[in-house]
Regions:
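Internal metal/ion-chelating core segments
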Residues: 202-260
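Extracellular "leader-to-stem" segments immediately downstream of a signal peptide or signal-anchor
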Residues: 2-14, 19-120, 127-193, 198-200, ...
Length: 260
């Protein structure tokens, strides 16, 4: 299938957000519906059920105070995520590098960014969500990007290809591991409960720990992951440079479709 499938609405939001009045209906799961590859006799993996996306339910993090000059944008990004109505909507991360994840800016005790049901988190081309450095990000086990109150459904985390990046700045964490420092990094993306998740068309690199975790004891199901590049240094690269415990995709629930 073609990579970097970009819906008209997402492109409009990134490149011409002020002119969003003529936005089209979000139709971004058509390709996924055709690519499920479900074996005969098996139930298909369900895809997110999303509302029509318009200017009224699209939220750019810059409008909530996020800045590429800021040391931390956690609170601004969370405000945009919280602004999504119960009926659903989309949060846009524009081009640029956006720091997040310092412990002092956390708005939750267990998650840094919390996404609620029926939300699309869209990283534009050239957008990087970069985790705060070791010693500033929490050393205790937290979820960096997860579901609000753990149980949410119909969530999309997407980009526009390999220039849409989530960067964990893991090198200092890995060195600390070799130096026997005490810390317990969580997953970069953890969808713990609920159902109908879609992660696609982006790159995750240099995470302190696991890249993506689906479910906790079977409590989450129906996840689709495709065209996601996961990049971590190999363990054989040598002392001070190798990544540690950076599993790609940990699956602990049923009905998960991973391809390309």
């Amino acid at each position: 299938m073609n990579k970097s499938i970009i819906t008209t609405i997402a492109l409009s939001a990134c490149l011409a957000f002020p002119m969003f009045a003529d936005a089209q209906t979000f139709t971004g799961i058509t390709a996924e519906q055709k690519a499920q590859n479900t074996p005969e006799g098996w139930p298909a993996v369900s895809l997110p059920q999303l509302p029509e996306i318009t200017a009224a339910n699209t939220f750019n993090i810059k409008d909530y105070g996020a800045s590429t000059d800021a040391e931390d944008n956690t609170k601004a990004i969370q405000k945009a995520l919280d602004a999504v109505p119960d009926a659903g909507g989309m949060v846009v991360i524009p081009e640029g590098t956006w720091m997040f994840g310092s412990e002092k800016e956390m708005t939750s005790t267990s998650e840094i960014l919390s996404i609620k049901s029926k939300t699309i988190l869209h990283l534009c081309a050239g957008a990087t969500l970069k985790l705060a450095p070791y010693g500033t990000a929490p050393l205790k086990k937290v979820v960096y990007i997860g579901c609000k109150n753990k149980k949410q459904s119909d969530i999309v985390i997407e980009g526009e290809g390999e220039t849409s990046i989530i960067d964990g700045q893991g090198a200092r964490w890995w060195l600390a591991k070799e130096q026997k420092d005490t810390f317990d990094p969580g997953s970069m993306i953890r969808l713990e409960q609920g159902q109908r998740f879609l992660i696609r068309n982006l790159k995750i690199q240099n995470t302190p720990g696991v890249n993506i975790t689906i479910s906790n004891g079977g409590k989450a199901s129906h996840a689709t992951i495709h065209d996601v590049v996961i990049s971590e240094p190999a363990s054989e690269i040598g002392a001070g440079k190798a990544s540690h415990n950076t599993d790609g995709i940990a699956i602990w629930g049923p009905y998960v479709n991973i391809y390309d």
